[in-house]
Amino acid sequence: MSVARTGKVVQVVGPVVDVRFEGELPNILNALHMVRNGERLVLEVATHMGEGTVRAIAMDSTDGVVRGMEVTDTGDTIRVPVGRQTLGRILNVVGEPQDEKGPVETTETLPIHRPAPAFAQQATSAEILETGIKVIDLLAPYAKGGKVGLFGGAGVGKTVLIMELINNVAQEHGGYSVFAGVGERTREGNDLYHEMAESGVIDPNSWENSKAALIYGQMNEPPGARARVALTGLTVAEYFRDLGGQDVLFFVDNIFRFTQAGAEVSALLGRIPSAVGYQPTLGTDMGALQERITTTKTGSITSVQAVYVPADDLTDPAPATTFSHLDATTVLNRAISEMGIYPAVDPLDSTSRVLDPKVVGEEHYHTAREVQRILQTYKSLQDIIAILGMDELSEEDKLVVNRARKIQRFLSQPFHVAEVFTGTKGVYVPVKKTVQGFKELCEGKYDNVPEAAFYMVSDIDAALAKAEKLKAAS
């Protein structure tokens, strides 16, 4: 560490602060500290302007910052507290606690800008992470140590799905999770914290009993914080993987806001924008984050990233850049949510590289493909049904349509985290039961069971029990 250098603020434009240093300049990405209204403010060096001046991005509001204020170069990048003591806590982009429970009791810190693991350290494995959510486990299973994208427009259920995954993994697998809230609603962050406390995922009074750490940089934060908070969360997750030998779950809600914040910072720094106004370094920024999320010989990070799709356009540069890094995609479709089927996962658009007979087994693979074939046939028949009606279909097509409608309803299930809203108890469905239920459904074993019996149930036994109830009620 070099001797602390001090400089003076010469210009403040919103979150951008220009600082003049006498002599040697701080390195790009170095953290600068200053005191504003009695509180520490962290800046990150972005550009060397020449004539002894650097341009830095503030990680918090610059209210109260005036010309002539003293700024100190830390000689290092932003460092954040890591370790088990971060579990059950809410931290901000620079690792300061936001939950009014005092400082994080750890002496260990790591820099948020770190190189990705070398090839020699990486490990490849093809193992499924069971989520207990039927549509995901059957049609687009998640790989342990893989990257998953949740794609969807506004209000189709990305955050609810993430909350259910955190809940299921904590309850069934007992692993640690790190949640990075990047530029999303403060209310949702608050709800998530209280729901985690209620479900036992975190204990607000004890890190020993907590299974998740929360790192927040919400919508109201300046762009510098939103552009870096995903890296802070990833650094906390990397500690558990590299030094704790853990299989960690890393949730990002929302990776689009990371790109959006990068575009804002880029514009503030005066860089020429590329397509649709995004930063020219879009691919580089995304790669720097995604390449660090990987499986090593000591542990793994399985990442689930919600991806907001602007105007439901999957060809927008932000979601399109994210696509290339993913092992599985879970696409949420507004048309499915409008039918009242939740989770609103599109069974034909969602993909996974581990849906392979070598990984999931022949029975699972063939059942999944048969389910997709039936749904695809139904989709291609919908125009005929809309114009001519069901009566014009052949007997074989009528059978396919009836099975497809049952499959659509059977792909829905009640969530634990939505119990408060729905009044229906949430369910966790093991993969074996999911595959068995859909296999028998495709074979025509339940052609005489009404389709209403398959809506919002766990497995095939629950569907048959519901059918008996419906029969008795009529």
Curated annotation (Swiss-Prot):
<dbReference type="InterPro" id="IPR036121">
    <property type="entry name" value="ATPase_F1/V1/A1_a/bsu_N_sf"/>
</dbReference>
<dbReference type="Pfam" id="PF22919">
    <property type="entry name" value="ATP-synt_VA_C"/>
</dbReference>
<keyword id="KW-0472">Membrane</keyword>
<dbReference type="InterPro" id="IPR027417">
    <property type="entry name" value="P-loop_NTPase"/>
</dbReference>
<keyword id="KW-0997">Cell inner membrane</keyword>
<dbReference type="InterPro" id="IPR024034">
    <property type="entry name" value="ATPase_F1/V1_b/a_C"/>
</dbReference>
<dbReference type="GO" id="GO:0045259">
    <property type="term" value="C:proton-transporting ATP synthase complex"/>
</dbReference>
<dbReference type="InterPro" id="IPR000194">
    <property type="entry name" value="ATPase_F1/V1/A1_a/bsu_nucl-bd"/>
</dbReference>
<dbReference type="GO" id="GO:0005886">
    <property type="term" value="C:plasma membrane"/>
</dbReference>
<keyword id="KW-0406">Ion transport</keyword>
<keyword id="KW-1003">Cell membrane</keyword>
<dbReference type="GO" id="GO:0005524">
    <property type="term" value="F:ATP binding"/>
</dbReference>
<keyword id="KW-0139">CF(1)</keyword>
<dbReference type="InterPro" id="IPR055190">
    <property type="entry name" value="ATP-synt_VA_C"/>
</dbReference>
<protein>
    <recommendedName>
        <fullName>ATP synthase subunit beta</fullName>
        <ecNumber>7.1.2.2</ecNumber>
    </recommendedName>
</protein>
<dbReference type="GO" id="GO:0016887">
    <property type="term" value="F:ATP hydrolysis activity"/>
</dbReference>
<comment type="function">
    <text>Produces ATP from ADP in the presence of a proton gradient across the membrane. The catalytic sites are hosted primarily by the beta subunits.</text>
</comment>
<keyword id="KW-0813">Transport</keyword>
<keyword id="KW-1278">Translocase</keyword>
<dbReference type="InterPro" id="IPR005722">
    <property type="entry name" value="ATP_synth_F1_bsu"/>
</dbReference>
<dbReference type="InterPro" id="IPR050053">
    <property type="entry name" value="ATPase_alpha/beta_chains"/>
</dbReference>
<feature type="binding site">
    <location>
        <begin position="152"/>
        <end position="159"/>
    </location>
    <ligand>
        <name>ATP</name>
    </ligand>
</feature>
<comment type="similarity">
    <text>Belongs to the ATPase alpha/beta chains family.</text>
</comment>
<comment type="subunit">
    <text>F-type ATPases have 2 components, CF(1) - the catalytic core - and CF(0) - the membrane proton channel. CF(1) has five subunits: alpha(3), beta(3), gamma(1), delta(1), epsilon(1). CF(0) has three main subunits: a(1), b(2) and c(9-12). The alpha and beta chains form an alternating ring which encloses part of the gamma chain. CF(1) is attached to CF(0) by a central stalk formed by the gamma and epsilon chains, while a peripheral stalk is formed by the delta and b chains.</text>
</comment>
<dbReference type="InterPro" id="IPR020003">
    <property type="entry name" value="ATPase_a/bsu_AS"/>
</dbReference>
<dbReference type="Pfam" id="PF00006">
    <property type="entry name" value="ATP-synt_ab"/>
</dbReference>
<keyword id="KW-0375">Hydrogen ion transport</keyword>
<keyword id="KW-0066">ATP synthesis</keyword>
<dbReference type="Pfam" id="PF02874">
    <property type="entry name" value="ATP-synt_ab_N"/>
</dbReference>
<dbReference type="InterPro" id="IPR004100">
    <property type="entry name" value="ATPase_F1/V1/A1_a/bsu_N"/>
</dbReference>
<keyword id="KW-0547">Nucleotide-binding</keyword>
<keyword id="KW-0067">ATP-binding</keyword>
<dbReference type="GO" id="GO:0046933">
    <property type="term" value="F:proton-transporting ATP synthase activity, rotational mechanism"/>
</dbReference>
<dbReference type="InterPro" id="IPR003593">
    <property type="entry name" value="AAA+_ATPase"/>
</dbReference>
